[in-house]
Amino acid sequence: MACGFRRSIACQLSRVLALPPESLIKSISAVPVSKKEEVADFQLSVDSLLEDNNHKSQVDTQDQARRLAEKLKCDTVVTAISAGPRTLNFKINRELLTKAVLQQVTEDGCKYGLKSELFSDLPKKRIVVEFSSPNIAKKFHVGHLRSTIIGNFIANLKEALGHQVTRINYIGDWGMQFGLLGTGFQLFGYEEKLQTNPLQHLFDVYVQVNKEATDDKNVTKLAHEFFHRLEMGDTQALSLWQRFRDLSIEEYTQIYKRLGIYFDEYSGESFYREKSQDVLKLLDSKGLLQKTAEGNVVVDLSGTGDLSSVCTVMRSDGTSLYATRDLAAAIHRMDKYNFDTMIYVADKGQRRHFQQVFQMLKIMGYDWAERCQHVPFGIVKGMKTRRGGVTFLEDVLNEVQSRMLQNMASIKTTKQLENPQETAERVGLAAVIIQDFRGTLLSDYQFSWDRVFQSRGDTGVFLQYTHARLCSLEETFGCGYLNDSNVACLQEPQSVSILQHLLRFDEVLYLSSQDLQPKHIVSYLLTLSHLAAVAHKTLQVKDSPPDVAGARLHLFKAVRSVLANGMKLLGITPVCRM
């Protein structure tokens, strides 16, 4: 695979540069394929070898590359070495390239790219990923979709790299909003509606009580009293709250099943309502609590003692806040999991909140606060269903399935499917995930129903179509051809481009593992699918000599395998027919 070639190049370079091969391997990268011209297979940035390259001109660097190229010799692995602008370029023996790459893809299967030497010094860690985190008693809003699919991707990637991952869904099941909801249900709730469509009814009640609270201060007072009763453990208030919670989780579980997502632990803010009192006691024992003129209890984070930056940890009526419960949750998780890293996947509007939580953990003496990380993301604009209004995830999933079924029905090449609804949902979800993951996570983006379902271009539908097409090719010709294959005959430009691209998969995985951005994998898979589409037209399997047909089938099988691996990391279930 790529690293076998990298090591061979690194060993040659080490003899000339008097550096250990290990220090050079990560500086040698596979060259991205080009539509315009044939490219080398690997390149070394000469800048990476120069300690003081800030003072080196382009001419100096180019001269260094040329002199270095002259000292290196071709061998059985490398057939050509050339100096480019600021780079050294290496071309691999074509027959060796073909055999090695296809053999590695076949042998490694779902681990292809993950066994690379790029990850050889990666310590295995215990990692907690908190994601999704919807608020109970509300229908699953589409705003939680990003946290859900991003968190799932991060957990998938970390797990694939051999880390021990715990997926936590930290449900918003406590707080002042439940004072409002409890009061609202007592004023406007109907038992019959709660039984037939629980979360829609609770949402309607919540909207109504919020409107009333704006005009009637007595409603706000009742809400504060209800939440205070919850915090004090009032049986009647807790019973109603527990019912809302159970109904919510029941519905959320169905949504996660449709998304193909699971959690190791369902936790909630309510679990930490008592533990948050321990946090307050610890903060008090360290002399960190101060009371404001309004009676709220705060921690001064300014560092200057002027209260220019504070975090409120308790209201004037003695009830806890989100930040206090988050502190309790972090401390409990460290006790329970002894994590090396804890990742919170939440929108960028929460950035200040997490900065304050991490800062308070440090002030409290928890050095492991450095291991906590917030992965922020932007908002989705324009994701509304045909009905308009507030967009619930269930409505989006239903619309995804409906639109995809219509698209599939209008395409003549659509196969007869055993379960068209399931296929439509999987393809539709791929479309939504790819549109979401194409850019940087921190960026807001404009959702487009029309763009998301295009079968051509850079879409999730195109990825699924490519995978299904390659499955059909294998199904049509079976394994017989593979036995007769002589992969060394794969020397056409289309074959070489695919092989060169397959070389890069480990680098792409490495990039995503460093910055936790799925866009690298998305871009890679889209390019792979475009290369496969071109090759499918030009590299015929049917009517070719058996050894050529077998070799091409072997190539397409490798593409399908890597495509499926990448899609699964992104949280997409590949379809075999569509």
Swiss-Prot record:
Any single Gene Ontology cellular-component annotation:
mitochondrion
The yes or no answer to whether the keyword Nucleotidyltransferase is present is: no
User: What SUPFAM superfamilies would the database entry show?
Assistant: Anticodon-binding domain of a subclass of class I aminoacyl-tRNA synthetases (SSF47323), Arginyl-tRNA synthetase (ArgRS), N-terminal 'additional' domain (SSF55190), Nucleotidylyl transferase (SSF52374)
Read off the CDD domains from this record. Answer: ArgRS_core
Query: Is the Methyltransferase keyword given for this protein?
Result: no
GO molecular function ontology, one term from the record: ATP binding
One family name in Pfam for this protein: tRNA-synt_1d
Could you say which residues bind L-arginine here? 133-135, 144, 322, 326, 350
Task: Tell me the InterPro entries matching this sequence.
Answer: aa-tRNA-synth_I_CS, Arg-tRNA-ligase, Arg-tRNA-synth_N_sf, ArgRS_core, DALR_anticod-bd, Rossmann-like_a/b/a_fold, tRNAsynth_Ia_anticodon-bd
User: Member of which family?
Assistant: Belongs to the class-I aminoacyl-tRNA synthetase family.
Protein name in UniProt: Probable arginine--tRNA ligase, mitochondrial
